Amino acid sequence: MLEVETAFIIHSTNYDQIFNVIDQLIISEGYIAKKNGIQIIHDTYFDTKDEILKKNEIALRIREIDEQVTKITLKKLKNTTKNYSERIEIEDTYTKEMLNQIILKINSYLNLNIFNDHLKYYNIDPKLTLKNLGFKIIQTRQTKRKIVNAISKSCNHTAFEFVFDTTTYNFDKNKNVTNIELEIELKLSNNIAVLDNFVRKLKINQPLVKFWPYNKLLTGKVIEMLLYKDELKENKDYDEKKILTLSGLEKIELFIKSKSIKKN
């Protein structure tokens, strides 16, 4: 499936204020805002030893939701615009069949056959399976996710999913850092113009949020690098609760942009 989404960093811990802003935004476009619960998510990302997935803009993830459901996910960047990104996504509950599908897709993307006889490594523990296949863990994080759906009045289906993520990136030596993010995901493909409009309104009218066109995997890797270079300073770039400040976000974005310029 094609995942179309955008993201903003939230500058406030006043959730009532943020929820009210999003409620009004949803209503202004003719949708019904409906809260859809809270999830606790644990994500673990993997790559090969030589990081071949990263080099090909592919992400491999194991996601545990509320300690009840475990999903395996593969994403590959397809396209980016000024307001959103498009990724090809394969995601489902972790099973032998899903593992097979994802490994075959990785081989297809890379035009390689580097994982032969992969099913013989299958284990009910997905992380152990991927390690046995030669993958390494490159990032772990925990997210508290609050979900608000934008419901279409005409068909009563979810047109957009708004999620408020409080995400803590876990690094060695207890160097954990948190950011608060709003993601908007398109659920009905004929509403792309409305997604653009949501983004435009938030960019222009909302000082509480900062447009953030960088995925969590990249954001976390840059945070990790800056922490170990001692370039993110406590009480300046992150507060006493380890939540990133605007100063910290600007350092992260500057680093990403500088690397992008060099690459181009």
Role assignments for model-derived ranges:
Residues 1-264:
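Phosphate-end processing signature that detects enzymes handling 5′-triphosphorylated RNA
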